[in-house]
């Protein structure tokens, strides 16, 4: 079931001229890119409710009470903005059935870890508010959340600003019997994935990362994986709207130099 509130394209209509100009520049950069290129599909099925918010789309897992994945396009103009971080976590009104609340995370030993981060949402007040919905949150190790994961979020904004736009999908990697927290039994991921697609020097490039849900500080290159490797681990097919020949090329390998790593 797809729940639509305000699509990203609609939200952009309310933005400044600079936002519109940047969006036009992005469309000129790659006019043949299919719409919603970031939306993945499952290779192996799992419970989900598909929800579309202002700035991102998510697949919510009603058994785990966390997202299966969160996907969005980040554009150059969206890396700028003055909407301040809210730090007010809310129940997602579009989740059917049980949605966790902020108290599930209290004294759990885990951060309320964003998938679509607040730092990517400063361009629009609705986007900022909705990224604090608990459907966009996973239990995340504090040191990971504030450390290497945050470093990658900042890299993503750098890439969007440099290349015009970047397509992003992220989410949890789960065990068969995960630890749970809170009265709503929110599942704790074993690890997290994040994959990126961008047109760099007129060629599509993709790269992925896997982080174990624990403390540690390493060079980002040590987390790198091919998209094919992450698909095998997660059971999710990323960027399926790419032409097959392009998809097969960019997903079998990655080039850290192309991404400036």
Where are these regions (language model features)?
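Domain-level detector for secreted/extracellular nuclease and nuclease-toxin modules, and
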Residues: 1-261
């Amino acid at each position: 079931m797809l729940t639509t509130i305000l699509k990203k394209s609609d939200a952009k209509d309310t933005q400044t001229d600079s936002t519109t100009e940047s969006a036009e520049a992005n469309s000129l950069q790659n006019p043949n890119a299919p719409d919603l290129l970031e939306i993945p599909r499952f290779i192996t099925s799992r419970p989900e409710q598909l929800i579309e918010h202002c700035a991102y789309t998510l697949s919510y897992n009603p058994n785990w009470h966390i997202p299966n994945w969160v996907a969005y396009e980040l554009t150059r103009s969206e890396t700028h903005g003055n909407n301040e971080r809210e730090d007010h976590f809310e129940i997602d009104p579009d989740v059917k059935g049980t949605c966790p609340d902020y108290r599930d995370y209290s004294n759990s030993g885990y951060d309320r870890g964003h998938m679509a981060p607040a730092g990517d949402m400063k361009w629009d007040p609705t986007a900022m508010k909705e990224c604090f919905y608990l459907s966009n949150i996973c239990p995340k190790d504090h040191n990971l959340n504030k450390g290497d994961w945050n470093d990658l979020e900042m890299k993503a904004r750098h890439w969007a600003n440099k290349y015009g736009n970047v397509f992003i999908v992220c989410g949890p990697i789960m065990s068969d019997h995960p630890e749970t927290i809170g009265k709503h039994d929110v599942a704790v991921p074993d690890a997290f994935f994040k994959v990126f697609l961008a047109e760099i020097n007129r060629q599509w490039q993709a790269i992925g990362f896997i982080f174990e849900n624990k403390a540690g500080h390493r060079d980002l290159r040590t987390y790198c994986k091919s998209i094919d490797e992450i698909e095998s681990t997660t059971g999710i097919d990323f960027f399926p709207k790419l032409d097959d020949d392009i998809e097969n090329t960019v997903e079998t390998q990655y080039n850290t130099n192309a991404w400036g790593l």
